[in-house]
Amino acid sequence: SERGCAFCGAKLVIGGVLKDTIQMIHGPLGCAYDTWHTKRYPTDNGHFNMKYVWSTDMKESHVVFGGEKRLEKSMHEAFDEMPDIKRMIVYTTCPTALIGDDIKAVAKKVMKDRPDVDVFTVECPGFSGVSQSKGHHVLNIGWINEKVETMEKEITSEYTMNFIGDFNIQGDTQLLQTYWDRLGIQVVAHFTGNGTYDDLRCMHQAQLNVVNCARSSGYIANELKKRYGIPRLDIDSWGFNYMAEGIRKICAFFGIEEKGEALIAEEYAKWKPKLDWYK
């Protein structure tokens, strides 16, 4: 399936969700097509991530003679075509990993040529693991090693958290954001639903890591705890009672239990009659 390889686990599940980032897939066209338009993660900026996918479109000659020049050319072309976008993730695929293309070196060269852009590389070809799970791990660990704490953002609340492992499937991240706003909690970074590249560079500034999908994103939460002392709290937002339990756990951490109970009461009053109909 489109989720069946390690590359897909990195690009389709996590990286490709970001709303302001060019997703450059260094490999044959099929690798890009297979991980495009197969997930429903909308954004509040016109669904940029769902409209576009980029590929170096490797052919046989590039496999034989190397694809680094083609990658460099493709990166410049993408930035030229999307002048408002200054962030990019570059992924290796099976062919480009097998021939040993050095995508990190190419990324450094492009960033030197274009000082206003930032590029993250994910070296996770399909064959590097037995399932998509390997791709989750590679992107999680690569991001915290290379990008976290490379930027600071303004903190506007006394309560801050990272919301990790939620990918805005059918807009759930945006719905949950309304709850955090009502509770007065600032989300430093969404990993990665409706999220931005630069917000993810600020994950070290949060007081709490709330994990919604542990399988895909628990790795970075564990590393944030180990390196920065940020506690990890797991919730399940899929389900009425589960969500209420999650809100209670988060509010207990911040000492705002009354706010949490008020929010839950409002939502119960709104939705319980409709839920009762199904009983």
Swiss-Prot record:
What are the boundaries of the signal sequence?
A: none
In the UniProt record, does the keyword Oxidoreductase occur? yes
Required cofactor names: [8Fe-7S] cluster; [7Fe-V-9S-C-homocitryl] cluster
- GO MF terms, alphabetically ordered: ATP binding; iron-sulfur cluster binding; metal ion binding; nitrogenase activity
Residues involved in [7Fe-V-9S-C-homocitryl] cluster binding: C213
InterPro entries, per this entry?
Nase/OxRdtase_comp1 (IPR000510), Nase_asu (IPR005974), Nase_comp1_asu (IPR010143), Nase_comp1_CS (IPR000318)
Catalytic function, reaction form: N2 + 8 reduced [2Fe-2S]-[ferredoxin] + 16 ATP + 16 H2O = H2 + 8 oxidized [2Fe-2S]-[ferredoxin] + 2 NH4(+) + 16 ADP + 16 phosphate + 6 H(+)
Note describing how the cofactor binds: Binds 1 [8Fe-7S] cluster per heterodimer.
EC nos: 1.18.6.1
Q: Which UniProt keywords apply?
A: ATP-binding, Iron, Iron-sulfur, Metal-binding, Nitrogen fixation, Nucleotide-binding, Oxidoreductase, Vanadium
Q: Write out the GO biological process terms.
A: nitrogen fixation
What broad class of enzyme is this? oxidoreductase
Q: Which residues bind [8Fe-7S] cluster?
A: C5, C31, C94
Q: Which one Pfam family would you cite for this protein?
A: Oxidored_nitro
Relate the assembly described in the record.
Hexamer of two alpha, two beta, and two delta chains.
Its biological function?
This vanadium-iron protein is part of the nitrogenase complex that catalyzes the key enzymatic reactions in nitrogen fixation.
Q: What more is known? A: The structure of the 7Fe-V-9S-C-homocitryl cluster is assumed to be analogous to the 7Fe-Mo-9S-C-homocitryl cluster.
Describe the family membership recorded for this protein in Swiss-Prot or TrEMBL.
Belongs to the NifD/NifK/NifE/NifN family.
- This chain belongs to which protein, by name? Nitrogenase vanadium-iron protein alpha chain
- High-level lineage: Bacteria, Pseudomonadati, Pseudomonadota, Gammaproteobacteria, Pseudomonadales
